[in-house]
Amino acid sequence: MKEKPIIGVTPDLAKNCQKYTYADFPWYALRRNYTDAIIAAGGIPILLPYQSDTINQLMELIDGIVIPGGDEDIHPKFYEQKYAEDLVISNEERDHFEILVLKKALEKDIPILGICRGMQLLNVMFNGTLIKHIPDYIRHFSKLTYSKKFECNTEAFATTVYTLPIKLEFENAPIKTIINHTQPKPKNIVSHTINIEVSTKLSKIANNCLQTMVNSTHHQAVNKLGNDLIISAKAEDGIVEAIEATKHKFVIGVQWHPEYLNDNGIDLQLFKALVKASKYI
């Protein structure tokens, strides 16, 4: 058993270099919260560069993997045949690299935590599909204000009470919701409730607290669930908030951003669970 397992993290790749830096070369981008969360959980983070010829050696080095979020969508060609090319905003280099990383990691049963876009990619890897734009899929109601107080008592976590205001808008779409899944800034604070399924890995990580609050900054979501996956949490409008694999030791995806380590009884515990699982590979 390793004292501090090595957790590989795939970065984003920025190519609009003239706007952001002094040299006209691509650069890797990764919010510090990811590495801070891994360190806080007892792991050592390392960046995984986009060189496919290094993958096999990296897989021998790392003990766990985090696939983080990002601004660009997974290209729909990876999960459906028909799509409008002019509506696609993606980073295919990142898609191809992360798919390769996940394929190798799943073959070796390396523990994986997918976050936001990372969860969506996990679903695609298991032959699932995505809702390409939530506002086209759900119906928001206008001229209403919704407040909810949430409270959960467990042995592990102190009681936390949240008051949640939600401003609602109307759109003509098939599913009703009161949740804005792309919350306004600040995007790190919790904004809506999720309901966790009993007897899942996620419920154990949350110490059997089956409801908590999370942040939300995504416009896509799981549509058709991938093979050998189960849904371990949903938002109150039915949008999938967490998935996990049934035939692997630790493969969990969450739609929110736990790297901000909100005091909600689950964010830090997710990273601790990943690090713990990574000690025993």
Curated annotation (Swiss-Prot):
<feature type="domain" description="Glutamine amidotransferase type-1">
    <location>
        <begin position="19"/>
        <end position="281"/>
    </location>
</feature>
<keyword id="KW-0808">Transferase</keyword>
<dbReference type="GO" id="GO:0016740">
    <property type="term" value="F:transferase activity"/>
</dbReference>
<keyword id="KW-0315">Glutamine amidotransferase</keyword>
<dbReference type="GO" id="GO:0006598">
    <property type="term" value="P:polyamine catabolic process"/>
</dbReference>
<dbReference type="InterPro" id="IPR011697">
    <property type="entry name" value="Peptidase_C26"/>
</dbReference>
<dbReference type="InterPro" id="IPR029062">
    <property type="entry name" value="Class_I_gatase-like"/>
</dbReference>
<feature type="domain" description="RPE1 insert">
    <location>
        <begin position="139"/>
        <end position="174"/>
    </location>
</feature>
<dbReference type="GO" id="GO:0005829">
    <property type="term" value="C:cytosol"/>
</dbReference>
<protein>
    <recommendedName>
        <fullName>Putative glutamine amidotransferase-like protein RP404</fullName>
    </recommendedName>
</protein>
<dbReference type="InterPro" id="IPR044668">
    <property type="entry name" value="PuuD-like"/>
</dbReference>
<dbReference type="GO" id="GO:0033969">
    <property type="term" value="F:gamma-glutamyl-gamma-aminobutyrate hydrolase activity"/>
</dbReference>
<dbReference type="Pfam" id="PF07722">
    <property type="entry name" value="Peptidase_C26"/>
</dbReference>
